[in-house]
């Protein structure tokens, strides 16, 4: 636990806490929370026994024998949770979007503030079920589904004739979906009863279609890839926009800069546009990512509008205090499935950013600016995001590591397939296709294949021919495959990156090990408590960047895994699939989880949740359950107001699997658990299907939203 707090490098002994809030029976109310034992609040009880729950084995078997999950935002005794914003609320000239994720708090004068909010993606079931009620107009979902089914479920919308009966319903649904994602800025005010939503002049929406009908609102792009966008001769598709971009979507997490801007991370863009690129960085045509809708999946939203895939998957900078300022995609930071951004800005040093690529086998990246920071608060620092060096992490099993620059002269030396085979795992090593007239990847199947590949391509320049910014831009557009070719470590879905203000360490959440056919986490680095090579419950890592103050190419770092997900009887700490982080001024680490709603063995952990790792006191380093979310949702985007008396959280996709909960729509699940003495016992769990949050009444549609959590007495969030 001391390692988690950055206080020791000794071997970390995993301990555990909880994940959801149980009740004494399938119909009873919630249990009282843990007795206070010097903890900063009374932690919630979860659905599984924990060493820290204060119960002996007999009591654990009694308490956890029958449990019901709650379709509610549950917080500890003495706290309250208030809905601040929800899907469909007016926001500027538009609406508060769907599936809000990352939140950034910007203080203004006079008790006013701004919340910058990401709207990540569309969950078709609850979105279709609630759209008419929320937006006040109907979309032709049934007609679209019927027409598409007759054509195999997918279509290249760009070739539809004007009088095709499919065209209008398709454009109506695709437009509405892209308008419901992107970024928003909402003004709030501090009243006696806490933070309240108040419309203001800073209210703003960017969507997936911003700039389509009003070209003056198109996003700018900076950095080397902008040179690729401007090329007139290319191997692939030309959208005719040069270095301008239509909209932003797949906005997951992000980061804030000391000069007042917000960085929004485009993550799973591959759902809607073509991800692979040619050797020159250009994209295949949108026809390769056709539009699809069947009521369960909604994909290829970029296809009807001819969006070029190489313009998505970037970090977007927005100034919430200047709505007239154009949003910018900074391509020097690389194109991959960005989850979040951590920013280190110190006077006299280069600007350093850290970001993870959230995919199985994704990498951890570091960006180092070419020039140095003069004043961290100077708005001119945005220019430091335009020229710099993108690097990718290579981890070693001994706890060391180094940064590999993604530059033309970087040697091609991908991992050997035998590295994975030694752990009895199949190698999933995609690298840029050896036929450089083709877009995308090929898999290295054997060590001999790897050696032949290296003989043919000595450096990244051999894979990405050209010169100058255009060559570097192509590498950055294809950052994930270029990183694989350069020998970066494939990791376990790296999600959030946050800097510890006390130690300077980088905190990284890795959501899950294993493979999905696209990539495989390195089993020499990411192992379960008993050495498992495909551990699905995730980790929290601390990374000490040795040259953070003066980062050189090929610099080194030290790393250690300091918290492991999983059940206590498996050696885990009681949570599953860590996702977003927030670190308060006292160094307490707040963490939310991203357990898929239907995830096999992970279902034992119940609803997704928010945890606290205290930095000091009797519970230092111990995960304490602070909140659980409604049914089938994630809690995301934790952030604080300036006094740290309010925690803001996004409640994303409630009812994602079953949409609206109806009276009596529950199922009973059975689990085999283990008490503190190692005795097995059975649990029956009542699980509502679907959600009615935030209305709280059966039959009411679920709506994603933002909550403000504070103490009922108005004191700081944590007791000192």
PLM regions: where:
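Conserved small-residue
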Residues: 4-720
């Amino acid at each position: 636990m001391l390692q988690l707090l950055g206080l020791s490098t000794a071997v970390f002994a995993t301990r555990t806490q909880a994940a959801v809030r149980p009740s004494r029976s399938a119909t009873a109310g919630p249990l009282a929370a843990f007795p206070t034992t010097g903890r900063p609040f009374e932690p919630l009880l979860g659905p599984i026994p924990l060493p820290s729950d204060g119960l002996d084995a007999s009591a654990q078997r009694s308490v956890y024998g029958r449990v019901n999950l709650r379709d509610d935002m549950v917080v500890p005794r003495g706290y309250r949770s208030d809905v601040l914003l929800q899907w469909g609320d007016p926001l500027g000239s538009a609406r508060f979007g769907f599936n809000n994720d990352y939140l950034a708090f910007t203080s203004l004068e006079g008790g006013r503030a701004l919340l910058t909010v990401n709207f990540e993606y569309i969950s078709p079931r609850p979105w279709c079920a609630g759209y008419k009620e929320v937006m006040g107009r109907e979309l032709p979902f049934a007609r679209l589904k019927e027409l598409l089914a007759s054509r195999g479920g997918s279509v290249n919308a760009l070739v539809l004739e004007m009088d095709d009966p499919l065209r209008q319903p398709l454009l109506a649904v695709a437009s509405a979906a892209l308008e419901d994602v992107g970024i928003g800025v909402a003004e709030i005010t501090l009243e006696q009863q806490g933070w309240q939503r108040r419309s203001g002049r800073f209210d703003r929406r960017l969507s997936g279609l911003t700039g389509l009908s009003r070209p003056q609102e198109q996003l700018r792009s900076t950095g080397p890839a902008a040179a690729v966008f401007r090329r007139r001769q290319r191997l692939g598709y030309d959208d005719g926009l040069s270095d301008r971009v239509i909209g932003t979507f797949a906005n997951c997490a992000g980061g804030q800069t000391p000069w007042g801007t917000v960085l929004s991370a485009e993550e799973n863009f591959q759902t809607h546009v073509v991800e692979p690129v040619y050797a020159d960085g250009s994209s295949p045509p949108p026809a390769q990512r056709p539009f699809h809708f069947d009521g369960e999946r909604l994909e290829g939203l970029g296809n009807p509008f001819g969006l070029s895939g190489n313009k998505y998957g970037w970090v977007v900078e927005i100034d919430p205090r200047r709505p007239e300022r154009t949003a910018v995609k900074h391509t020097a930071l690389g194109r991959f499935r960005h989850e979040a951004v951590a920013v280190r800005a110190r006077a006299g040093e280069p600007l350093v950013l850290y970001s993870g690529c959230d995919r199985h086998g994704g990498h951890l990246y570091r960006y180092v600016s070419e020039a140095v920071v003069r004043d961290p608060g100077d708005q001119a620092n945005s220019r430091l995001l335009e020229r710099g060096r993108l690097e990718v992490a290579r981890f070693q099993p001994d706890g060391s590591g180094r940064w590999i620059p993604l530059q033309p002269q970087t040697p091609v030396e991908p991992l050997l397939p035998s590295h994975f085979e030694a752990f009895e795992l199949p190698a999933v090593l995609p690298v840029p296709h050896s036929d450089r007239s083709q877009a995308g990847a090929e898999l290295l199947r054997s060590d001999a294949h790897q050696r032949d590949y290296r003989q043919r391509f000595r450096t990244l320049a051999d894979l990405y021919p050209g010169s100058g910014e255009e060559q570097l831009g192509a590498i950055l557009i294809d950052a994930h495959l270029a990183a694989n070719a350069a020998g970066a470590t494939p990791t376990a879905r790296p999600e959030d990156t946050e800097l510890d203000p006390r130690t300077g360490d980088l905190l990284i959440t890795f959501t899950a090990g294993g493979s999905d056919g696209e990539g495989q986490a390195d089993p020499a680095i990411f192992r379960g408590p008993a050495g498992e090579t495909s551990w699905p419950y995730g980790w929290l890592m601390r990374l000490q960047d040795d040259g953070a103050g003066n980062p050189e190419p090929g610099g080194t770092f030290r790393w250690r895994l300091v918290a492991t997900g999983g059940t206590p009887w498996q050696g885990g700490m009681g949570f599953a699939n860590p996702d977003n982080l927030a670190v308060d001024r006292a160094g307490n680490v707040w963490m939310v989880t991203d357990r898929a709603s239907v995830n096999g063995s992970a279902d034992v952990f119940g609803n997704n949740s928010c945890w606290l790792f205290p930095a000091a006191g009797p519970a230092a380093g111990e995960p304490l359950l602070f909140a659980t979310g409604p049914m089938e949702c994630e809690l995301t985007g934790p952030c604080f107001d300036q006094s740290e008396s309010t925690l803001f959280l996004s409640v994303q996709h409630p009812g994602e699997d079953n949409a609206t909960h109806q009276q009596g729509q529950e199922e009973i699940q059975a689990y085999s658990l283990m008490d503190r003495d190692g005795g097995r016992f059975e649990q029956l769990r009542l699980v509502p299907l679907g959600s009615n949050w935030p209305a709280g009444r059966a039959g009411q549609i679920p709506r994603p939203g933002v909550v403000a959590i504070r103490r009922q007495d108005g004191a700081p969030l944590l007791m000192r």
